[in-house]
């Protein structure tokens, strides 16, 4: 259980680490438009993202896919930027948009998984039996994501319910900030 606990902790700490705020920004942008009463939709979004990053994390760790880390480091903020833009133009009542959002969470998870893989590969080294470590790391990532979602729900509740800020204004303001930060990140990481 020692290995499992270690990699679970590392996955959790990796996604909740402020130094790696790009993943935090993505989860924030992904669930920001949803009130806590729509927790099922958020759970589906986070699960789709987890499935995506789990697939590419495993494929990359097992050297089945190799993509330049400079491209991945560029594409990660692009996924954040697109998600923040979608928040600005989004209509919560349109189920077609929700299906698109689920699909984009899965697709963007594929990109983020390759970013996670660089970190995980550096810890694993040449160990041949890495299934347990891979599972533990993914579970840790998922737990960290759920903590971020809870924080978003709580902070949004404070601003929208207690401070009476209109939800659409809150979403627009925070998404605008996320857009600006991710644009700067993308420009700083241009791979060409």
Identify the residue ranges that each predicted region occupies.
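Membrane interface segments of multi-pass transport proteins and intramembrane proteases
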Residues: 64-68, 91-96, 155-173
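Histidine-/acidic- and/or cysteine-rich, low-complexity loops and terminal segments associated
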Residues: 1-24, 93-97, 186-192
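Final/C-terminal transmembrane alpha-helix of multipass membrane proteins
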Residues: 29, 171-189
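Membrane-interfacial alpha-helical segments at the cytosolic side of multi-pass membrane proteins
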Residues: 24-40, 63, 85-87, 123-124, ...
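Juxtamembrane transmembrane-helix termini in multi-pass membrane transport proteins
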Residues: 10-60, 64
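Membrane helix-loop-helix hairpins that form the core translocation module of multi-pass transporters
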Residues: 41-94
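Interfacial helix-loop-helix junctions of multi-pass membrane proteins
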Residues: 6, 57-74, 118-138, 147, ...
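Divalent metal-coordination and catalytic microenvironments
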Residues: 23, 53, 81, 112, ...
């Amino acid at each position: 259980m020692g290995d499992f606990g270690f990699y679970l902790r590392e996955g959790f700490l990796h996604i909740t680490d402020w130094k790696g705020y790009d993943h935090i920004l993505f989860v924030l942008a992904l669930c920001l438009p949803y009130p806590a009463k729509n927790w099922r939709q958020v759970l589906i979004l986070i699960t789709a993202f987890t499935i995506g990053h789990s697939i590419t994390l495993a494929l990359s760790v097992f050297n089945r896919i190799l993509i330049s880390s400079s491209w991945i480091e560029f594409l990660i903020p692009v996924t954040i930027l697109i998600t923040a833009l979608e928040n600005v133009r989004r209509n919560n009542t349109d189920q077609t948009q929700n299906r698109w959002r689920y699909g984009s969470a899965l697709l963007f998870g594929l990109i983020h998984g390759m970013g996670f893989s660089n970190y995980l590969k550096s810890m694993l080294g040449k160990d041949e039996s890495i299934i347990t470590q891979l599972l533990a790391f993914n579970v840790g990532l998922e737990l960290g994501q759920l903590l971020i979602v809870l924080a978003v729900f709580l902070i949004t509740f404070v601003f929208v319910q207690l401070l009476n800020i209109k939800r659409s204004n809150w979403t627009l303001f925070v998404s605008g900030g996320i857009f600006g930060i991710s644009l700067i990140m993308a420009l700083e990481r241009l791979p060409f």
